[in-house]
Every structure is written in C-alpha cells, then in structure tokens.
C-alpha cells in the first residue's frame, strides 16, 4: 500500500500539476513509515476508555479495517498505561498488530515511561507535559525564570527520550494552540511563533540525546492559525537544517459538513503546498467517519488513489438524461474498481473534452442514447437504459473488471 510513482517534473515547478512534497526523514511507527517520501499516512483516535480492554480492541480493529493506519489511544493514568499491554496482546491474538500511539498529557513522565513499553509512538503536549499552573498575578517571566523551567522540562523529558531511543520507537511533539505553556504565552504571545518555539524547545532536547524519531504537529481550531503555524515551522526547520515529518490536523473541527470543510481547508491547503506526512481529520462524530474524509482529501490532491475517480458535470439545460440518477447508478456499479477514472457527462459540450483524462466515459449525445468512450475514443452508442450495463461490459472486455 505504501508505494509511490516516480515524481513528474516540469521546467517551471510553480506551474506543475504534480505536488512536490517537502523532503522529510522517515520515522517508523510499527510497520508504517511516516515521511521519507512514503505516502501520507492516515490516523485517528478511539474514544473508548482505555481501561475497557474489549471495547478498545474492537474500536482499534474497526478503525484499522477501514484504512486507519495508525491508531491513538488516551492514557491519563498509570492504570491506563498498563492496560495498553493487554490491548496490544489481544489485538495480536484476535486480529493483527496495529501501530499504536499513546496520548500523554499533564505531568506524564511516569505514565509515558510505562506506556512506552507497549506502544509504537508516544505523543506528548509541550504545554502540558511539565504543567505549571498559571498564576493570576504574574505578568511576565524573567530570562532566568524562563530558563529554570526549561531545565525542569529537560530533566523530565530526558528519561522518556532515552527510553524511546533505546527501544527504537517514536515520539510526536504535539503542540496545541489552546494549551501553550504560560511562559510561552508571556514570551511570544498567543501566536504561531509561540507554538513553533514550544516545539523547537522539545526538539532540541531530543537532538541533544541523539534521538531523531520525531513527528511534529502544531494544531489549532482556527484554520488561519494552523496554516501559519505549520508554514512557520517549515521555515524554521529549513533554517535549522531539520527535516522532521509533520502531522497535520485542525483540532476541534466540529461535526457534519462544516467540520469536514474546515478540516479540508486546513489539511488540504498544506498538502497542496507539499507540507505534511500524516493526517488526522478530527470530527465530533464516531472516529470511523474520519477515515473516508482523509482518503478523499488525499485522492482529490492526487497524493493517494484508493477509490474510483469520478468526473461529472454539474448538469444544465443541455443535459440529455437524469445526470444525478445515472451518476449514482454508475458509482454503485463501479465503486470497487480502485484506480479507474470514470466520467459521466450530460451532453457533448462537456463530454469528450472535459473527460479527456478519464479511462472511460458515459456521455449524452442525443435523446434516449448515450455514447461510451475509452479514453478519447468513442466505442459505441447504446440506448440509455442499457448504458450502465454496457459500460460494465466494456470494462470487462478490457480486462479491467473485478467482481465486487
């Protein structure tokens, strides 16, 4: 599943139709690789209590079967951390090993050290890992105070970094705009710069211990903040000679149509710029509903092709058949033929030209009849009521049909 075609180039990259992804180091998470030119990885997170062993195993399996390649679980206590050992064991017994990430937050050193034994990656939040309760009377941090807390962070982070390094496992430094540490807020403000500096502080500690299996995220609930943070992170990493892969997401995107649009606006924009190595669409819905959105974003950008690509005009007064109904029938009949491009066009105006790149075309040319195309070549004209059946026969004749 993790294979890439040879990138195409033109003499003017700014007008290229191929997305040129930023070069990043490969980071292994179980049997999945993030970055390093591998396909963009799809992630999600279960919402079961990790102490519910059976429920967690079932939830992880459901996500993985839908195409979620890395699954995150929350680990708020030592009991939850130890439960991961059983979850991992049961997954292997009743299903198969699945790359797992533990989400560790407030003052989580002991929890992180325990759970690092049982998962493939540990996610920490720099704003909460060494949690300093905000003071209502404080208005600034002196340089000495800033550095004192920085040293405390180093002492607390080092044991986890050493553990992950020695086990060959990975870490995600996951900055959230809404949970920046107070000293970062006072020093840099509630800004993308504060998010980036927060991540860099943790990266430098990791690098000082020769640990480089790092993935970075800088999430925000507002798309413009999220975009600015990732772009600034890339700029700073380029300046510092860093090549860590990036995990993209809009946190707290909500639900329904708007939640999907909001996530796509953030994630899709960065991916189109070549930024991003793994994604999670965060919806206030069942986690399983996040996975199709992820793959749709990747397919739309040409980064991963995991379904049929349908090209269809929006319909107008020239349309010679019920376009919406026919598109539905074509989709239902062919949606399992991963890798094909199929065009459904209502009239000859938008027909051959607009669908030139499609493998097959279904075009209205005169009332009661449709024309079937292979690429740019018209193959036959058939009665409208036989159109879908004849399209299937054409695909079969070309040896490109597989039974659903």
Swiss-Prot record:
Binds 1 [4Fe-4S] cluster. Converts 2C-methyl-D-erythritol 2,4-cyclodiphosphate (ME-2,4cPP) into 1-hydroxy-2-methyl-2-(E)-butenyl 4-diphosphate. It comes from Crocosphaera subtropica (strain ATCC 51142 / BH68). The lineage of its organism: Bacteria, Bacillati, Cyanobacteriota, Cyanophyceae, Oscillatoriophycideae. This is 4-hydroxy-3-methylbut-2-en-1-yl diphosphate synthase (ferredoxin). Belongs to the IspG family. InterPro entries: Dihydropteroate_synth-like_sf (IPR011005), IspG_bac (IPR016425), IspG_bac-typ (IPR004588), NO2/SO3_Rdtase_4Fe4S_sf (IPR045854). It catalyses: (2E)-4-hydroxy-3-methylbut-2-enyl diphosphate + 2 oxidized [2Fe-2S]-[ferredoxin] + H2O = 2-C-methyl-D-erythritol 2,4-cyclic diphosphate + 2 reduced [2Fe-2S]-[ferredoxin] + H(+). Pfam families: GcpE. Its EC number is 1.17.7.1. [4Fe-4S] cluster binds at residues 313, 316, 347, 354. It comes from the Bacteria. GO terms for biological process: isopentenyl diphosphate biosynthetic process, methylerythritol 4-phosphate pathway; terpenoid biosynthetic process. Keywords: 4Fe-4S, Iron, Iron-sulfur, Isoprene biosynthesis, Metal-binding, Oxidoreductase. PANTHER family: 4-HYDROXY-3-METHYLBUT-2-EN-1-YL DIPHOSPHATE SYNTHASE, 4-HYDROXY-3-METHYLBUT-2-EN-1-YL DIPHOSPHATE SYNTHASE (FERREDOXIN), CHLOROPLASTIC. GO terms for molecular function: 4 iron, 4 sulfur cluster binding; 4-hydroxy-3-methylbut-2-en-1-yl diphosphate synthase activity (ferredoxin); iron ion binding. Pathway: Isoprenoid biosynthesis; isopentenyl diphosphate biosynthesis via DXP pathway; isopentenyl diphosphate from 1-deoxy-D-xylulose 5-phosphate: step 5/6. Its cofactor is [4Fe-4S] cluster.
